[in-house]
Amino acid sequence: MSTGQAHLNPYIEGDSVLHGLDSIIKTMSLLGLLIFIALIPTGAWAFYLLTGFLLLSGYLLAELHLMEMVKRSLFVELPFFFILVPLLLMRQSDTLVQFELLNRPLNISAAGAERFFNILVRSWFSILASILYASVTHFQEFASAMRALGIPSPIVAIWSFMWRYLVLLVNEAQRMLRARSARSGRVVGQQAKAGGSLAWRASVTGQMVGSMFLRSMERGERVYQAMVARGYDGEIRAHARPILRPFHKIFLSLELLIITLLVITAFQVYGLR
């Protein structure tokens, strides 16, 4: 594994139950859980607790460091938090909190707060589920499972190339940073930092970024031409094409049935809101 791939790869080595589970089963479970999270009605907190329990059980079965995974998920969740903040101020009925910002009165309504926390929890659970899946499933297993589930080959190819080109970009960036460090030494005992002003550093950084993308594009083109020369026609045939076996179809049917029953129950209890 290259250095860039080692930095990017979210997979965590292990011998837990989830690590050894069939990749198609894991992929169907992830997709089913994401669909269920998206369909939970607003305010159905009991079903959010059920989802949280399922995720906690998954992390325990995977034998992962729970707090480390939670920190990683919160880091990914942070942009969603700022995007969702305006929801707190969209509805003016049932005011919970009233305050002023820049001499302008603002109200946080009960309906807006409920919608804010619902979407925030949904996005966080989706991130936790995705991190759990990525931690116990190799990327190649994910691509094979997508092919087995009938996902169109161009989409699988785009995912595969995205991963490989991200690795390529990281490798190029690491090479350029090493070269920069080798050329930016300073005299032992010298207190001043090596290099010029802030504007000079910004100029050098911009040139490095531009050079990195040009070099990455050239290298990517060489890789693609080498693949075409070896018979690549849009589908990677490094492994035998996986197929859906009878137990996969049974599992998928049961999963869809359970999700349907849970969603119907949630809407009957909490209604459409």
Where are these regions (language model features)?
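Membrane-helix interface segments
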Residues: 44, 65-66, 151-155
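Alpha-helical transmembrane segments and their helix-start/interface "positive-inside/aromatic belt" motifs
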Residues: 67-78, 251-254
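Hydrophobic transmembrane alpha-helix segments characteristic of membrane transport
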Residues: 50-57, 140-145
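Structural signal for the C-terminal ends of transmembrane alpha-helices
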Residues: 39-40, 58-64, 136-137
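Short, aromatic-rich membrane-interface segments at the entry and exit
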Residues: 43-50, 68-71
